[in-house]
């Protein structure tokens, strides 16, 4: 099974463009050491502006990895038993890294840039089994107040662009991997446009699932101030996003979509990893459940390394309890 860790190389996927990467090599070294310790066999590396792309060098920021550095880290990970998977997020709420091209979304120039980058990354990563293309939270209003330009796709345009991006990946011999939002929220339309064999889905659940583990909104100020808190719910898990991901993620897997559910320590919920692995492992068709991922959603730096290690530890503990003990 896949036991994956999401890692940030680039960081310009949110709100503003930083001119310099915060990525720290010392944190990366500790991360890899602990990945081996905790049985991580795959890292999904969010590239963004963190690579000096030959096709579009204008996207790289200070501190971006050279192509030689990417190849060296790919080989380093292989020797550790870790598969390094590239990620490029093309969602309209997470594409600050595309620079001026984000303002050209759904134009011929944009499509060419997307294809150029996907093809280069496929070659650079030695033709990986998967290429993650993001596509989460497209049109999510919570991002609009912070963004300097608000535009997103909907209707047939979003399905056209998702299909195009998937086809770019498939033409490179890889399988496109996406966050499961579009399938979770529009399951019928998704099934019409994207066949079961054309994509890997990651439903993401960052709080508990078992009712006895639910998280009181009033227990933390960050919960009170969150979107869930503003809804007036008593527990974080009552919010539609978590109910939908929990329910539709299982349905999609049992319908035939290959699935890698994602947990996280981001929500500060001590039961998240356990509940996500228990729920999806016990309820999904095992043939379609490829494995699990954890995403700490922090920069790869020494300030955040403890959180990254905790993510791997929680995933390993849940794996031992609910998968290896079976």
Task: Report the location of each language-model feature.
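Substrate-binding cleft of secreted/luminal carbohydrate-active enzymes
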Residues: 255-326
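Short secondary-structure transition/capping segments
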Residues: 86-99, 128-139, 177-183, 219-238, ...
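Extreme N-terminal starter segment of soluble prokaryotic enzymes
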Residues: 1-3
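Glycoside hydrolase catalytic-domain groove-lining segments
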Residues: 187-265
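Aromatic-lined carbohydrate-binding surfaces of glycoside hydrolases
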Residues: 6-200, 205
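Short acidic/glycine-rich loop or secondary-structure boundary segments that cap or lie
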Residues: 141-142, 185-188, 209-212, 268-270, ...
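Well-ordered, non-membrane alpha-helical segments in soluble/globular domains
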Residues: 24-29, 64-70, 110-115, 154-164, ...
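Short aromatic-enriched loop/helix-cap "lid" or pocket-rim segments at secondary-structure transitions
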Residues: 144-146, 213-214, 305-306
């Amino acid at each position: 099974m896949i036991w994956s860790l999401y890692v940030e190389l680039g960081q310009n996927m949110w709100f503003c463009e930083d001119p310099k990467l915060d990525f720290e090599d010392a944190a990366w070294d500790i991360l890899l050491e602990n990945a081996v310790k905790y049985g991580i066999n795959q890292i999904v590396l969010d590239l963004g502006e963190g690579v000096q792309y030959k096709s579009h060098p204008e996207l790289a920021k200070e501190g971006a990895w050279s192509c030689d550095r990417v190849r060296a880290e790919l080989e380093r990970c292989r020797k550790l038993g870790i598969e390094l998977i590239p990620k490029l997020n093309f969602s309209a709420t997470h594409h600050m890294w595309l620079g001026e091209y984000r303002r050209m979304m759904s134009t011929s120039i944009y499509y060419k840039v997307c294809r150029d980058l996907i093809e280069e990354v496929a070659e650079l990563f030695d033709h990986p089994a998967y290429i993650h293309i993001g596509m989460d939270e497209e049109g999510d209003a919570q991002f609009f107040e912070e963004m300097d330009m608000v535009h997103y796709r909907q209707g047939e345009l979003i399905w056209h662009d998702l299909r195009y991006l998937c086809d770019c990946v498939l033409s490179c011999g890889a399988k496109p991997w996406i966050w499961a939002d579009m399938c979770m929220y529009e399951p019928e339309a998704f099934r019409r446009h994207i066949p079961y064999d054309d994509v890997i889905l990651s439903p993401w659940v960052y709080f508990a699932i078992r009712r006895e583990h639910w998280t009181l909104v009033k227990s933390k100020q960050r919960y009170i101030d969150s979107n869930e808190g503003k809804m007036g719910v008593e527990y974080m898990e009552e919010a539609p996003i978590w109910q939908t991901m929990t329910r539709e993620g299982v349905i999609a897997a049992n319908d035939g979509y290959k699935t890698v559910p994602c947990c996280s320590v981001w929500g500060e919920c001590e039961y998240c990893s356990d509940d996500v692995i228990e729920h999806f492992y016990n309820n999904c068709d095992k043939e379609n459940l490829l494995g699990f991922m954890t995403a700490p959603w922090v920069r790869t730096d020494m300030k955040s390394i403890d959180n990254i290690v905790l993510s791997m530890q929680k995933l390993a503990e849940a794996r031992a309890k609910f998968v290896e003990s079976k």
